Amino acid sequence: MQLNPSEISELIKSRIQGLEASADVRNQGTVISVTDGIVRIHGLSDVMQGEMLEFPGNTFGLALNLERDSVGAVILGEYEHISEGDVVKTTGRILEVPVGPELVGRVVDALGNPIDGKGPVNAKLTDAIEKIAPGVIWRKSVSQPVQTGIKSIDAMVPIGRGQRELIIGDRQCGKTAVALDAIINQKGKDLICIYVAIGQKASSIMNVVRKLEETGAMEYTIVVAASASDSAAMQYLAPYAGCTMGEYFRDRGQDALIIYDDLTKQAWAYRQISLLLRRPPGREAYPGDVFYLHSRLLERAARVSEEYVEKFTNGEVKGKSGSLTALPVIETQAGDVTAFVPTNVISITDGQIFLETDLFNAGIRPAINAGVSVSRVGGAAQTKVVKKLSGGIRTDLAQYRELAAFAQFASDLDEATRKQLERGRRVTELLKQPQYQPLQVWELAVSLYAANNGYLDDLDVKQVLSFEKGLRDNLKTSHADLIKRIEDTKDLSKDDEGALRAAIESFKKSGAY
């Protein structure tokens, strides 16, 4: 049989034209080792830093180390079922978490999955956990207060909306208590709160949630929990996830407050991940970019301008500035604030509140050291009445601490020094405050006014707090109109000052304390 070359070529052409070939291009690699949640992958190309990788069993990881012939990734969640030789695929996506008002009142993990047993979150939107902070041009100066309800903070270390104020101290000296009081005091103040628990015992986190529910604070609070039993990856990601949830409100012209409790544990988790990824260790075995770990997080807390909000919402929200206020917590070891992470975070934040174990053990709670605590920008946000009355308190306290040290060695003191010491003792007593009992602005103003004008000087030190409480109760029942004026105007006019003076003198004469 004779084959015609032209027929053969025609046949081949027709076959080629009728061929249906589908090309499915997928970028995939192979697991070569798994160690403590860190996976090394060979064969992945075109993978991005921070990209999500898909492992078998619907498990995801995060690409962190991009090397010449391998990729180092951290697993998000359980990794026991992953073994050598498993196929890993790129997703082309970066890690996102759910955001929106649906999260308020819920307890979620670092990936936004609910862990409170109240069903799915049903958030309509998601957002990237790593975002660039707003530029200088989009920011506004801090000018509105965040009232914590804690006398010593609101009077001496005021916090403004959009500020970053560090809470620093040893373990068990009241750092979380200060943060929780700040959340509880936001009831009815149109401020969404986010509490990020990092590396704490699950039972401690549960106690926090229970206390927030008891005080009605969960109605405006989101809790992001990465407990000590969670992986290092979850503890590393939790603050960024919480920050993204807070930015949703900031960028839409609302105010939010976020508490990171605490960033020391996040730094430990990041150190663990970095060492397992074989990154070169530096001071205290932390990797070289541990400063950037916290700076890129805390720079996202800001007060943004009306123009920023309008641009972000495509003109839907006009004339409103948003804010995200951050209260990072750092745990020191034996009061050493010169360690690597504490000094880093002190330099990033706009001030710090130092809590001291010695003061805590002496019964001065909250155990705030007024001498070294400072707020660099909060003074501009203080309410008029508190600003007017708080200057004398700080001076009295600072002079008292200085004189008290000298008085230990001096046998006979002159009258002026003795008076200064006596007033200092009473001011120190006045600034004591039980947990979960934050004060309103007018209550703080009344206490400061009484201290500044010598109404506490002739009282016994043990009577100071009972006098203060009795005075507040008396004003509530007999001078409600005066309270309302102070609360509404956030100022103390000449007439109101006269009325307040008369009310205090009348109460003091009655001796009902």
Curated annotation (Swiss-Prot):
GO cellular component: plasma membrane; proton-transporting ATP synthase complex
Keywords carried by this UniProt record: ATP synthesis, ATP-binding, Cell inner membrane, Cell membrane, CF(1), Hydrogen ion transport, Ion transport, Membrane, Nucleotide-binding, Translocase, Transport
Record EC number: 7.1.2.2
Record carries keyword rRNA processing: no
Binding residues annotated for ATP, in chain numbering: 169-176
Cystines in this chain: none
Compartments where found: Cell inner membrane
Membrane topology value: Peripheral membrane protein
One MF term in the entry's GO annotations: ADP binding
Catalytic reaction annotation: ATP + H2O + 4 H(+)(in) = ADP + phosphate + 5 H(+)(out)
Enzyme class: translocase
Keyword Transferase: no
Listed Pfam families: ATP-synt_ab (PF00006), ATP-synt_ab_C (PF00306), ATP-synt_ab_N (PF02874)
Family membership: Belongs to the ATPase alpha/beta chains family.
Protein purpose: Produces ATP from ADP in the presence of a proton gradient across the membrane. The alpha chain is a regulatory subunit.
Self-association and partners: F-type ATPases have 2 components, CF(1) - the catalytic core - and CF(0) - the membrane proton channel. CF(1) has five subunits: alpha(3), beta(3), gamma(1), delta(1), epsilon(1). CF(0) has three main subunits: a(1), b(2) and c(9-12). The alpha and beta chains form an alternating ring which encloses part of the gamma chain. CF(1) is attached to CF(0) by a central stalk formed by the gamma and epsilon chains, while a peripheral stalk is formed by the delta and b chains.
Name of the protein in question: ATP synthase subunit alpha
Taxonomic source organism: Burkholderia vietnamiensis (strain G4 / LMG 22486) (Burkholderia cepacia (strain R1808))
UniProt gene name: atpA
